Swiss-Prot record:
EC number(s) reported in the record: 2.2.1.7
Swiss-Prot/TrEMBL catalytic activity: D-glyceraldehyde 3-phosphate + pyruvate + H(+) = 1-deoxy-D-xylulose 5-phosphate + CO2
Annotated GO MF terms: 1-deoxy-D-xylulose-5-phosphate synthase activity; magnesium ion binding; thiamine pyrophosphate binding
Organism (species): Tropheryma whipplei (strain Twist)
Known role: Catalyzes the acyloin condensation reaction between C atoms 2 and 3 of pyruvate and glyceraldehyde 3-phosphate to yield 1-deoxy-D-xylulose-5-phosphate (DXP).
A Gene Ontology BP annotation from the UniProt entry: thiamine biosynthetic process
Gene designation per UniProt: dxs
Any Pfam family: Transketolase_C
Protein name according to UniProt: 1-deoxy-D-xylulose-5-phosphate synthase
Length: 629
């Protein structure tokens, strides 16, 4: 890591072509500057650190070997793109992942060097297949490069794409497997074992590089001799590599493994790949967090994603006097573990996100009752249906945005068979800095049309614990959704009605205005009701923790009201709004288009999902209704 905060070489780069004039010494210094810049910048804003530290040399070699944007580079997963952004002239990392700042993923809005905002894993090879096919048809002979890493090869889409790529090899497609042995944490499964066999064989890389060095010391004759026999050397050494067999059976040429932190070796490999001019796999071995000791010492995930940290230690930068708050994810993980201790039928399923979804403690206590299936959401859900068939109660812990990928399996494998599978949808609603692709706003629209499913949205830690205990005893499909971040303060009910409907504010005798608050929106709605009361307008706030299907008590309450207000943190979808027509309904939901990045509070305020905005809108609409009577 550089000791001086001087980035002269980095700051001189405005396009990838600027790299062409750099000397080897300057390139070495540039790698140092880039790595230090990433550490210092991401420490201030948070972001994907470990992954990007591992692709510094790879990104520079790619841009020196190919001609972006004419040769298009597609990253999978897209969070590996920070160095790519720097090389393509985007140096303003002060507002990385903040409102109006640089995206943490590739973005066409930022640069024509970015092809796809691919923050959902395993899609790049399908994109590369389509782009390369189109270029062949259109007579465009530029290269398409797919950089596939951070566990993306555990996703089925990659293999579907490889199946099609191998069937049509008349195109210039380079597939770079960035093999760091991890997704968030260590990559699991059979594919990972194939790749790990190569990574574990350090003698393989050493023999390849040593043989080249020996011949190079013989001068020009030695280098010519090596060029002539390197194929035989590679073939001999590849006999020790199971990875070569894995890819060669797909009838796609394989080159590697290559030391991903040796720029010279990378550029040589890419030169060979270009000469082949057909689909080829370049297997690159990298180290997540390379060059930054705190990342390498982080056994959990090599500082995959960080918040604001102290760059000298990699530790979270705590604010003086700040009290640590429980998170929704943490409360879920603790409660599931507690329930599993007494209910041996509870098992957990996750798609390469054991720690981010709160299952680490569960895995430590019950390693044989948790199943990490890799980045394979469709498989996770269908496998859970099989677990349920044998009498277990699987809890599928998944981010709301990734649930979209498995909708068919929810419908056809779980719901069609009435399987008692519980989906725990973390990061539901507005998530914040990861932007449009990570907001969990579509789950309500999708799941409300699934026959037989029950949907729950706890408002605080207590209702989350109670709800989790309830759904783990249900004999039907269920789903619980909660947002990202610190859990809300407990909001006790004033009174509980039948079917689990809680009254949070107001008198049940006054039904001029009934506010139906779903999940965490209960807090904003109670605040709105308090503000309305200050203006002499009385209202009742009810909170159905199980909000779908619609309860008769909810329908009975709203049928008598002069104004019905619905507040939920999701895109507008079928529900109460279909039951209440016309002026009597006022909805507070998330607009149905893609939402930008920014802090959760910033975005909720901009949308109008806060107590003050809700109160103003209710007051204006209620006055209209009164004046029209």
């Amino acid at each position: 890591m550089c000791t001086k905060r001087q980035y002269g070489l980095l700051e001189s780069i405005r396009s990838p072509r600027d790299l062409d004039s750099f000397t080897p010494h300057q390139l070495d210094e540039l790698e140092c500057q880039v790595r230090d810049f990433l550490i210092q910048s991401v420490a201030k804003t948070g972001g994907h650190l470990g992954s990007n530290l591992g692709v510094v040399e790879l990104s520079i070699a790619l841009h020196r070997s190919f001609r972006s944007p004419e040769d298009c580079i597609i990253f999978d997963v897209g969070h590996q793109c920070y160095v790519h952004k720097l090389i393509t002239g985007r140096h303003d990392f002060k507002a990385l992942r903040c409102k109006n700042g640089l995206s943490g993923y590739p973005s066409r809005h930022e640069s024509n060097h970015d092809i796809v905002e691919n923050s959902h894993a395993s899609a790049a090879l399908s994109w590369a297949d389509g782009v390369s096919r189109a270029r062949t048809l259109l007579g465009n002979d530029n290269y398409v490069i797919a950089v596939v890493g951070d566990g993306s090869l555990t996703g089925g889409m990659c293999w579907e794409a490889l199946n099609n790529i191998s069937d049509d090899n008349n195109r210039r497609l380079v597939i770079v497997v960035n093999d760091n042995g991890r997704s968030y944490a260590r990559t699991i499964g059979g594919i990972a074992r194939f790749l790990n066999a190569v990574r574990a064989s350090k003698s393989y890389l050493w023999l390849r590089e040593s043989s080249e060095a020996v011949f190079s010391h013989m001068g020009s004759p030695g280098r010519r001799l090596y060029q002539g026999i390197r194929g035989a050397i590679h073939g001999f050494l590849s006999r020790f590599s199971s990875s070569n067999k894995l890819f060669s059976n797909l009838d796609i040429r394989y080159l590697g493994p290559i030391n991903g932190h040796n720029r010279k070796a990378l550029e040589k490999a890419f030169k060979q790949a270009k000469q082949y001019a057909r689909p080829i796999i370049v297997h690159v071995i990298t180290e997540k967090g390379h060059g930054y000791p705190p990342a390498l010492e982080d056994a959990l995930d090599c500082l995959h994603t960080v918040g604001v940290i102290d760059p000298s230690t990699g530790k979270s930068a705590s604010v003086q006097g700040q009290v640590r708050q429980d998170t929704w994810t943490g409360v879920f993980g603790e409660e599931l573990l507690r329930l599993a201790e007494s209910n041996t039928n509870i098992v957990a399923v996750t798609a390469a996100m054991l720690h981010p979804t709160g299952l680490s403690m569960f895995a430590e206590k019950f390693p044989h009752r948790v199943f990490d299936v890799g980045i394979a959401e469709q498989h996770a859900v269908a496998s859970a249906a099989g677990l349920a068939y044998e009498g277990l109660h699987p809890v599928v812990a998944i981010y709301s945005t990734f649930m979209n990928r498995a909708f068919d399996q929810v419908m056809m494998d779980v719901a069609l068979h009435g399987a008692p599978v519980t989906f725990v949808l973390d990061r539901a609603g507005i998530t914040g800095p990861d932007g449009a692709s990570h907001h969990g706003i579509w789950d309500l629209s999708l799941l409300r049309i699934v026959p037989g499913i029950k949907l729950y949205a706890p408002r605080d830690a207590s209702t989350l614990r109670n709800t989790l205990a309830l759904v783990c005893s249900e004999d039907c499909p269920t789903a619980i959704r909660f947002p990202r971040g610190s859990v809300c303060d407990d909001l006790p009910a004033l009174r509980s009605l039948d079917d689990g409907i809680d009254v949070l504010y107001g008198s049940c005798d006054r039904e001029d205005i009934v506010i139906v608050a779903i999940g965490v929106m209960a807090h904003a709605c109670v605040r709105a009701a308090q503000l309305l009361a200050e203006s002499g307008i009385e209202s009742t706030v009810i909170n159905p923790v199980c909000f779908w299907p619609l309860h008769r008590q909810v329908l009975a309450r709203v049928s008598k009201a002069k104004l019905v207000v619905l507040a939920e943190e999701g895109a507008k979808s079928p529900g109460l709004g279909d039951y209440i027509a016309g002026r009597r309904l006022l909805e507070f939901v998330i607009p149905g288009d893609f939402q930008p990045q920014g802090s959760r509070d910033e975005l909720l305020d901009a949308i109008g999902l806060n107590g003050e905005h809700i109160a103003r809108k209710i007051k204006a609409r209620f006055n209209q209704i009164i004046n029209c009577v």
